[in-house]
Regions:
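Exported/periplasmic cell-wall-interacting domains
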Residues: 37-38, 47, 51-52, 179-256
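Surface-exposed, secretory/extracytoplasmic low-complexity segments enriched in Ser/Thr/Asn/Gly/Pro
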Residues: 1-177, 182-192, 246, 253-256
């Protein structure tokens, strides 16, 4: 940098004159090591590094790795004490007209950062909470089984959404759902529903999926009575987000 070099040097016609402690000479040209060091500290040093990016993995409650969000990379920083005399060394190189100035670096190893994805579903308030560690990142309205009371969430019928702790064991972007249930009162319940979207199975035949029967937005879900055979229905406008966020193996807790 020509302007930097100009500000760090002066012309002295008397080659025998006494120099300051921070100065060196090349003929009539005197170089100021302190000014060279200042330029390095302010203009060059801030760019002599590569910021570390940690590897980010998604895990479930058991600590099992479900996916890798970012691979990350090591960082590079200046080695301790490697640049304390850059100004003096550079001044010497300029004074002699030979050599170079090298600054040693060291690796700042990337770390692995674990983020726990988990789902909590409360049947009493009919909400699904998507957690990343201990932070709720999204709250969705849900419609659950017809046997669950719409206010208390208690199982008061023959077809209820199961409670307890589960893991997502199968995911399908779309599925035709059909089945038959022989109920305790002797009746037989059958269904055949086409194109159920964004399906996340967590317990046997029970899944979290886009609510069937046509478009329903998340905001409208609270006005719909419970009516599934055990599945958890979510709004059409949030189903794809949840499907992409919820990995295979994600922990699911369902409570009343």
């Amino acid at each position: 940098n020509a302007s930097m070099l100009g500000s760090a040097m002066r012309i002295d016609a008397n080659q025998q004159s006494k120099l300051k402690d921070n100065e060196v000479r090349n003929g009539y040209v005197v170089f100021d090591a302190d000014k060279l060091q200042q330029y390095y500290d302010e203009q060059i040093k801030p760019n002599l590094k590569l910021e570390r990016e940690d590897k980010k993995v998604v895990v479930n409650n058991a600590g099992e790795v479900l996916s890798t969000e970012t691979e990350g990379h090591d960082g590079i920083v200046i080695a301790d004490g490697a640049d304390t005399e850059v100004g003096a060394r550079l001044a010497q190189v300029l004074a002699t007209g030979t050599g170079s100035v090298n600054v040693d670096g060291k690796v700042d190893p990337k770390q692995e950062v674990k983020v726990t994805h988990r789902v909590a579903i409360d049947l009493s308030d009919r909400k699904l909470y998507a957690y990343e560690n201990d932070t709720v990142v999204k709250t969705l309205n849900v419609v659950v089984a017809e046997g669950n009371d719409n206010v208390t969430g208690e199982c008061v019928g023959m077809m209820c959404t199961p409670t307890g702790d589960f893991n997502v064991w199968q995911k399908l972007p779309s599925q035709d759902m059909s089945g038959t249930l022989n109920l305790a009162d002797g009746t037989v319940e059958t269904w055949d529903v086409k194109d159920v979207g964004f399906v996340n199975y967590f317990s046997s035949g029970c899944a979290i999926h886009r609510i069937a029967g046509g478009y329903v937005a998340d905001a409208v879900m609270p006005s719909i009575a419970n009516g599934s055979h055990g599945c958890v229905g979510i709004g059409w406008d949030v189903a794809e987000w949840f499907y992409n966020w919820c990995n295979m193996g994600t922990s699911v807790h369902i409570q009343v």
